[in-house]
Amino acid sequence: MHMTDVLPAGDISKAVEAFAAPDSFNHKKFFEMCGLKSKGPDVMKQVFGILDQDRSGFIEEDELCLMLKGFTPNARSLSVKETTALLAAGDKDGDGKIGMDEFVTLVSES
């Protein structure tokens, strides 16, 4: 499954382009711009499944770094600062990774 199977390609492109500059990523604005925030939990879970590249049931720090690439392959990687901030925002139980429920909460609260 590809991200464009669940979200409009145009919205994804606009969102990724808006945060092309290093250290410009804002997860709240990104989730809104790509259209994910307005979707229900089922779509959010599909997106989680795409971002969880190793199928561990969690999005770990190395996968968070590649999050924009999960939306479109030619996107940049997140910086260490951006990755750390995203993990801090989403990791509600402090285990160093983001589970599916945490991801849905992260997107919904954005």
UniProtKB/Swiss-Prot annotation:
A cellular-component GO term for this protein: cytoplasm
Binding sites annotated in the UniProt record for Ca(2+) 1: 52, 54, 56, 58, 60, 63
Residues annotated as domain EF-hand: 39-74, 78-110
Sorted UniProt keywords: Calcium, Metal-binding, Muscle protein, Repeat
Keyword Zinc belongs to the record: no
GO molecular function annotation: calcium ion binding
Binding-site positions, Ca(2+) 2: 91, 93, 95, 97, 102
More info: This parvalbumin has an isoelectric point of 4.97.
Similarity annotation: Belongs to the parvalbumin family.
Function: In muscle, parvalbumin is thought to be involved in relaxation after contraction. It binds two calcium ions.
PANTHER family (UniProt xref): PARVALBUMIN ALPHA
Record-given protein name: Parvalbumin alpha
